[in-house]
Amino acid sequence: MQFVHMADNHLGYRQYNLDERENDIYESFLECIDKIIEIRPDFVIHSGDLFESPQPPVNAIRCAMEGLLKLKEKNIPIYLIHGNHDIPKSQQKGKPFGLLKKILGNSLLTFGKNKSHVFNNEVFIGGIEYVSQNKIPKTYEDLEKINSDSKNYKKKILLFHQSVNPFIPQSFEMQVTDFPDDFNYIAGGHIHQRALKPINDGNSVFSYAGSTDIMSVSEVKDYKKNGKGFYLGDLSGDFDINSIQKIDVECRNFLIDKKIKNENDYKKTVEELQNLQSEKKKPILYCDIVENLFNSFNDEIANLTLYKRISRIDENLEESLIINESSIEEIFQEYIKNKEMDVNFVYGLYKKLLENDEDSLLYVNDYFKGNY
């Protein structure tokens, strides 16, 4: 019996405010769906953040519907929890999964009041949706009930969407030891880097599936090391970390941390960009360059990248001035995302304050009522 674990598609996210990056994220999701159909697992579990926003754009909804309908046509059910990006900040607004459920019916199973489902009378699947730090005590109560309800099952999976220590030691909401110790697979979302860890003396596997595309430049190094995509698990026999394998998708190339201090560095970087032109998608470039080479380099690579962020290096001052194609708003949004803050709320408040919006306090009040 096989299952797929996926998370953090963030459909609708427009990195650098580019159509091409929004489409990349749709394509990565649909590539995952196509690979899942090739594998034909018994079911799919999804650990949240299907969408970038709780009010996703039409194209994001269309993409999600296209992919999930393909699974339905192959009789592959999907078990899905809400991540922080999927949950509306105002209680008056509906959740996007409602529309999906109306069309997909029982092939899409979510975890609201009902914290568990059972697949084929054999596999117990529990789910706890994302909550803010102040609501974690309620999550512990939910975990106790899930653990109690699962006692008569040998095969058990638990979905969650939180930051967990030691994977995020600087800013976490829960500990690995907070989770029931007799579940086979603890399936996480929220963290965009892949992670697999045997726990409970190797009898359980704790996992983050990671995102299905590069959502931030901070993810590039991990992508090159561990890839992006989903996990495939096998519950047929004795279950341990060897029962899990990575299934990868290909993302657009990012060239980062390039230092151009002389003509040789210049030539190598241009050649690397030229060699990537045979790929279907133009790369994204982050680099530092000395002042005297900046103008010629900027002109030469003008048509070789989708997006570039170049820092001029003043070797005397050992400082850099960033010259890029971003607006202040784009840089601000990326900074918020890198800090793992709530991009939708912080950026929404920022815009309201700029416009002297009288509803700013109501906006903040609705957010905190819904999250704390």
Curated annotation (Swiss-Prot):
Top enzyme class: hydrolase
Cofactor: how bound: Binds 2 manganese ions per subunit.
Any Pfam family: Metallophos
Secretion signal span: none
Keywords: DNA damage, DNA repair, Endonuclease, Exonuclease, Hydrolase, Manganese, Metal-binding, Nuclease
Top-level lineage group: Archaea
EC number: 3.1.-.-
Regulation: Nuclease activity is regulated by Rad50.
Binding-site residues for Mn(2+) 1, renumbered to this chain: D8, H10, D49, H192
A GO molecular function held by the record: manganese ion binding
Keyword hit for Acetylation: no
Function: Part of the Rad50/Mre11 complex, which is involved in the early steps of DNA double-strand break (DSB) repair. The complex may facilitate opening of the processed DNA ends to aid in the recruitment of HerA and NurA. Mre11 binds to DSB ends and has both double-stranded 3'-5' exonuclease activity and single-stranded endonuclease activity.
HAMAP family per the UniProt record, alphabetical: Mre11
Family classification: Belongs to the MRE11/RAD32 family.
This protein's name: DNA double-strand break repair protein Mre11
Phylogenetic placement of the source organism: Archaea, Methanobacteriati, Methanobacteriota, Methanomada group, Methanococci
